[in-house]
């Protein structure tokens, strides 16, 4: 079968032929329809320091997808041939304390699809049936293919009660924009998103944020005054991993504010911890999606009218995958979809 693989320890992704993966007793065989390119895939393409430490070569990459069930392991129940599915890209052990306690997303033995085991940038994918999620008929293939990153946004945004709150989102990448859209959809008062990339800030405006602020040109305190905010933000969603953005967030949070952090800052990032302490801030780290509550909320948010369509900006055939990666690497894109049909 055709697959996009990391074949060499250098920049790039290559189209290759690999065997169709073997179906285990508890697995589903999925024929891939559409995949989306993640920032993680771009890191792997660029062969940065993280990738060099993490990715075995060769490796079929990719973990954002939608497809059709074409094979079912003999122990599997609840699925049938033809079911349209996406799936959780974190394969968990099932036997650690967190897994057994119902906190599966905190499994210490997590294996990543397209990172530690073969991924979805291929004609077929095998995953445990436990990880598959049936897609409702009224959700399109395009939207289903981005459920993985949408789940990061939903998990981050819904970490705290947002109704009537003022929310600051730092980082207008696709996940940050989707998190801002979720916050607005569920009843936040003001949702302000910050970045320095004007293309992505314009995408955020299309998604209905209260204000999209280019912090290279505008002062955030002036924006807060314009919105009538006198006490700071109630909730912060840190999606950028940029130290200056996080420091600004700490400066502008209200006392007792709550911060969810998905962005990964450099290990040597320094902050003024007195602001965390004396403001009584609560900071929560976010990794992946809650299994599977986040997935049900994703489907329900779309079914209740949340429109994510503006975030998908580019669509290519899999044979034009290089154009897709070029678009993602340019920084002038939202989500990029690759069609395998």
Swiss-Prot record:
Residues that bind Zn(2+) 2: 93, 96, 99, 107
Pathway(s) served: Amino-acid degradation; L-threonine degradation via oxydo-reductase pathway; glycine from L-threonine: step 1/2
| Cellular component annotations (GO), alphabetically ordered | cytoplasm
Cite the Gene3D superfamilies for this sequence: Medium-chain alcohol dehydrogenases, catalytic domain, NAD(P)-binding Rossmann-like Domain
Localisation: Cytoplasm
The Swiss-Prot or TrEMBL record annotates one GO molecular function as: L-threonine 3-dehydrogenase activity
Active-site annotation: 40 (charge relay system), 43 (charge relay system)
Entry coiled-coil feature ranges: none
Known EC number: 1.1.1.103
Quaternary structure, from the entry:
Homotetramer.
What this protein is called in its record is: L-threonine 3-dehydrogenase
Q: Which gene encodes it?
A: tdh
């Amino acid at each position: 079968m055709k697959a996009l693989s990391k074949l060499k320890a250098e920049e790039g992704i290559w189209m290759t032929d690999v065997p169709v993966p073997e179906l285990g007793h508890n697995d589903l065989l999925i024929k891939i329809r559409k995949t989306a390119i993640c920032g993680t895939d771009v890191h792997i393409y660029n062969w940065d320091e993280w990738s060099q430490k993490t990715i075995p070569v060769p490796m079929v990459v990719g973990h954002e997808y939608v497809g059709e069930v074409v094979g079912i392991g003999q122990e599997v129940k609840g699925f049938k041939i033809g079911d349209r599915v996406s799936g959780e890209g974190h394969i968990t052990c099932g036997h650690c304390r967190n897994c057994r306690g119902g906190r599966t997303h905190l499994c210490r033995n997590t294996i990543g699809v397209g990172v530690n085991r073969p991924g979805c940038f291929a004609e077929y994918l095998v995953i445990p049936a436990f990880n598959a999620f049936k897609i409702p008929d009224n959700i399109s293939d395009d939207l289903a293919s981005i459920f993985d990153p949408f789940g990061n946004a939903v998990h981050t945004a819904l970490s705290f009660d947002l109704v009537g709150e003022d929310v600051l989102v730092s980082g207008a990448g696709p996940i940050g924009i989707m998190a801002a859209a979720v916050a607005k959809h569920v009843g936040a008062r003001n949702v302000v998103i910050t970045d320095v990339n004007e293309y992505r800030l314009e995408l955020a405006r299309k998604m209905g944020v209260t204000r999209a602020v280019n912090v290279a040109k505008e002062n955030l305190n002036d924006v807060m005054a314009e919105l009538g905010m006198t006490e700071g933000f109630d909730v912060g969603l840190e999606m950028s991993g940029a130290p200056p953005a996080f420091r600004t967030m700490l400066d502008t949070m209200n006392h007792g504010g709550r911060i969810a952090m998905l962005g990964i800052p450099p290990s040597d990032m320094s902050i003024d911890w007195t602001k965390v302490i004396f403001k009584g801030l609560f900071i929560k780290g976010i990794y992946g999606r809650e299994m599977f509550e986040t997935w049900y909320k994703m489907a329900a948010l779309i079914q209740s009218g949340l429109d994510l369509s503006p975030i998908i900006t580019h669509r290519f055939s899999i044979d034009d995958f290089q154009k897709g990666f070029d678009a993602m690497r340019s920084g002038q894109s939202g989500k990029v979809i690759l069609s395998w049909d």
